[in-house]
Amino acid sequence: MYRVTILVLFLLVALTWGTTWLAMRIAAETIPPMFATGMRFMFAAPCLIFIAWLRKTPLLFPPGQRLFQVVICVFYFSIPFSLMIYGETYVSSGLASIIFASMPVAILIASLFFLNEKTNLMQITGLIISISSLAGILLEEMKINTGGHWQGVIALVSALIIHAIIYTQCKKRSSTVSVITFNALPCFFAGLILSAAGWYFERPQISVFSAQSIFSTLYLGVFAGVFGILCYFALQQRASAFQASLVFLVFPLIAVSLEKYIYGYAISTHSILLVIPLVIGIFLSIFFK
């Protein structure tokens, strides 16, 4: 039963993360990126705050860490998530998911710089393989799809780097706050900031918002932003770090398959072949910790 629970949680997280990228693409079809991200967080925040109230979980970080809570709001939620959906206005959801599948590698690199963590030959080999493969995929896709493609890639890679740095800073500070505390208030204030900024700078026309885009932001907020977070946290508690990290190897396959099925678009054959060494590189980086 224990193994079944781990498998179910793993599949739920993989499906949630895999569908998130397609949902962001649909949301950005009629809603400006910044405003859509603000809507996403405003849908998620009340649910997270309600869960905190039910569990009697504090909303504020412990004294001495509350300035870092502001950092989380800006550099974990506001900027990276806006960059993600902005990036998807230029690149496919499948390619975006492949970029973010490299998160374990980005975290390893950030840990080397900010935490002075020791590494080994296999991890370094994995880093070289994965970075080279990802670079090959990006160059191949940018060669095929010119005109603004590079803007999306830069936005997504920037979001990846920022998330990796914030992760290492959380680890460095030995933050012991609960997953609800970590997400609730930063998510709420990020939603307010992005909704206000999006309304002022992007001038969204509510009359052109499609039902699909609105539903996608609701899905991103409530399902991916709340249910997905809780499932991944539960998976981390029950599974080994290695087992939980395998999600990063699975969710891009779901994202690419969904995009192919719904939009009929797929990354090039060369890029698909380069995914194989990318997965091997990520696997080596995770497994030989």
Regions found by a protein language model. Give the residues of each.
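Specific transmembrane alpha-helical segments of multi-pass solute transporters/efflux pumps
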Residues: 16, 20-21, 49-100, 136, ...
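Juxtamembrane helix-loop-helix junctions in multi-pass membrane proteins
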Residues: 15-46, 92, 165-189, 203, ...
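Juxtamembrane helix-entry segments on the extracytoplasmic side of multipass membrane proteins
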Residues: 2-6, 30-34, 38, 61-67, ...
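C-terminal transmembrane-helix exit sites in multi-pass transporters
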Residues: 49-56, 103-128, 252-273
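Helix-helix packing/entry segments at the starts of transmembrane helices
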Residues: 37-39, 95-102, 168-191, 221-261
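Cytoplasmic-side transmembrane-helix entry/capping segments in multi-pass membrane proteins
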Residues: 64-72, 119-131, 153, 177-186
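Transmembrane alpha-helical segments that form core, pore/gating elements
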Residues: 48, 107-109, 113, 144-202, ...
